Amino acid sequence: MNKRFAGLHSTLQKPLRHNAFRYCTCCQPIALPANPARRNFLAGGLAALGLGASVAPVAAQTAAEKTRIDVHHHYVPPVQGEAMAKHGGQAPKWSLQSSLADMDKAGVTTAVLSLAPPGVWFGDVEEGRSLARACNEYGAQLRKDNPGRFGLFAALPLPDTEGSLREIAYALDVLKADGIGLYTSYGEKYLGDEAFVPVFEELNRRNAMVYTHPVNPACCTHLADGVGPSSIEFATDTTRTIASLIFGKAGTAFRCPDVRFIWSHSGGTLPFLIGRFIREQVVRKDPRMPDGPEPIVRKYFYEIAQGNEPGQFAALLKLVPVSQLLFGSDYPYREAIEAANGLRAYPFSDAERASINRETALRLMPGLAG
């Protein structure tokens, strides 16, 4: 199935001291007549492969396909956009109207909002706390003003642990957010780092939903000449952080088994590297996982944005059952209709598509039912 590949996350031409814009150093957003919210991909990179055609509309959507829940939908509160500009970055083009239009085009009834990278951390504790609060309140207001159209994954000011614990309480108890949105790494620290244990212990106590989104890792930039880091490293950073939870010294995956993780992009490279995870346990012989790492990753959830090609689905479904898959778009960086087309092209049954499109999301977050 041919798709038009939009560009990747725009950012600075060089990394900041605090890695605030660790998502792409290769390009700036441009306006395309068909959809000004899409980003320009590296020029000519995929044209030679015959993958340059525009995404076609989903034809003859069924009733179930008109009630999708999108769990990977970014928004940009004005205060976040201002902070990005202040620190030398550029926010993606976003508006409430453009979000709703993209949702309607692809039959998305409800989108769960999460901040566009890099979130709220720019190196200053007080700024991070203030931004997290302001962005979360903005998202909660969008949800209130548009009944049934939005959910919310609240932002935290990590790596500020104390501020994050306060924001968890406010976001979940006061704002009634549907879950928490985190990034795969913060500077040199991945989610399994010991520094983040207090945050995950609190999330575990609450049996919280935790949606994760990759960033461009501090360790790996410009490894392939002319290829933006997010083309490769986003998927790999997801796998790194899952490994940190399972194999890290803190043992977060074992200490906090009730955190309900959603991993972006069909798990990144995890489905293709699971054999290496298995081998790691053969060597380690960790008594906490006598059956290896597979039971751990099988209980996690995976959304399908930029992870809906046939080969990606096939690999992911060798690892987890359909009950662990969720619909996601990665808007505004990609259109929801792209994921919808990918889902329809794969030989899922109607019941399986209904599970991915809506039912699993409602099972995990019943508040999205309205």
Model-derived segments and their meaning:
Residues 72-74, 213, 265:
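Histidine-centered divalent metal-coordination motifs
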Residues 15-28, 74-94, 123-124, 129, ...:
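Active-site gating loops and adjacent loop-to-helix segments of metal-dependent hydrolytic enzymes
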Residues 2-36, 40-54, 62-67, 71, ...:
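Mid-to-C-terminal alpha-helical segments outside catalytic/metal-binding sites
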Residues 211, 263, 328:
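Generic enzyme active-site microenvironment
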Residues 113-242, 248:
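Active-site gating/metal-coordination segments in enzymes
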Residues 249, 259-293:
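Aromatic-lined glycan-binding groove of carbohydrate-active enzymes
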Residues 92-93, 121, 158-164, 187-194, ...:
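Acidic-and-aromatic substrate-binding clefts and catalytic sites of carbohydrate-active enzymes
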